[in-house]
């Protein structure tokens, strides 16, 4: 959201949009309809939103599991991977009450073991999809935003101020 504010662009979160369209939380979708249904809803949201101009689109970590979503995200503009260690991701999840209440377990293990397991699958896809990688370890949010802005193509920054 802060990046969008700096660019003077709109901001949307795919998880929020899935919940809005479904009228249920992600946890409820997983519990009643399963992960495949959630991933299809997520895919539909990305397909709809990736065509919008001047939009910072925040996705859940699993959005890149779908090849069509990866293609659409890359075609839409720069894709930023906010990289962090397993421990940092775990700490951030525990510090965010909204994430704790909305996020279902993705494996039988949960916790740090789950994060490690999921990252082993997703990291190659993040690398494939990302045009910009920012290591967020030890950085404040304002520093992360500054690093992303440094890496964005100049033409995008010029467009944001016109």
What is the predicted function of each stretch?
Residues 12-74, 95, 99, 106:
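ATP-dependent small-molecule kinase phosphotransfer cores
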Residues 10-12, 104, 132-134:
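Structural signal for short hydrophobic segments within the conserved structured cores
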Residues 1, 68-71, 91-95, 146-147:
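Short amphipathic alpha-helical segments
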